[in-house]
Amino acid sequence: MKRTLIGMLLVSLCGGAAASPLSAWNDTPAKQAIETWVHDATDANNHAFIPPEKRYVVFDNDGTLWPEAPITFQIQFVLDEVKRLAPEHPEWQNDPLVSAVLKNDLKTVAAAGEKGLLKLLAFTHSDITTDEFNKRVASWIDTHKDARFGCQYNQMGYQPMRQLLDYLRENGFKTWIISGGGIDFMRVLSEKMYGIPPEQVVGSFALGEFSLTKDGSQIRKTMQGAFNDDAANKPVAIHLFMGQRPVAAFGNSDGDLAMMQYTASNPDYKTFGLLVHHTDAAREYAYDSHPPASGKLVEGLKVAKEKGWVVVDMQKDWKTVFDPAQCPAKTAQ
């Protein structure tokens, strides 16, 4: 009897010590809704069961899996690349947009709008082989840190969302990124950061040019045939790259609304929708209708209420924002 009691105690202690797969989430209705949907979708005896081959789920990246404020990380990469490359390009010397970048005059850069952004993207994302571009992104990720948090960008994935990705995969779901960010940029880091392989990452892209070389072959990036994977283009990209309608969608802005509506209208299965609402100025940023750069969230909140989607209140629903082992918490002063 004594041994039995000791054994029961050990089992109890071990069970109590086991970490919850969503330990970075507070025990709120948002977390409970996730767990309930996953349970029902994976229970073969439940009317909401989804066969494993149909368990495709899609995530936005900027603002959903990692921060997009005060500017997106890819835009920061563009600015840093212009500064790094400028000495090699004397023809840029009299360009007012480049001068603004070199002076950290972000107001002038922002005022240049989409036309200015495309120009900077042409300077940093075209007429370069895909292999060289990947090396540049990897080097930047390994050597640059976020100005506010002092962490490397690849350490700033939201811990609750990274846990959610793992949790879904453990339950037989296939996780995809469908984002307005550059497809090549995200593919460099997606597997290491999120466990999502490059072939399951879809983003904005332009056509490349193939050619043979003395050492084999290469693809050079161009700005031709650019496709902006945002808003109404997201469902189009899902159709082109995935070939089937998702059963769950996770986003944070009105730019994700079409993707979520496309998912919600899946005629065969009970779907799930979740929006991350940035409400934590102390641990991250707080915005919706007036974001620092991208991520406006107005219409999405209205539709979420109508459709019964989960709206995550970052301040209340997340126990941690970043993994403290990688990016120790820093609150606003």
List each model region and its residues.
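Asp-based phosphoryl-transfer active-site loop
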Residues: 55-70, 260
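Secretory-pathway/luminal and periplasmic proteins that interact with or process carbohydrate-rich
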Residues: 66-68, 108, 192, 199
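Ser/Thr-centric signal marking residues that sit
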Residues: 4, 64, 175
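C-terminal cap/substrate-recognition subdomain and adjoining C-terminal extension
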Residues: 19-25, 29-35, 39, 54, ...
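Short loop/turn motifs at secondary-structure junctions and domain boundaries
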Residues: 47-51
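A metal-dependent, Asp-based hydrolase signature
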Residues: 70-71, 76-155, 159
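Gram-negative bacterial Sec-dependent N-terminal signal peptides
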Residues: 1-18
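Short, solvent-exposed loop/turn elements at domain surfaces
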Residues: 43-45, 66-68, 210-211
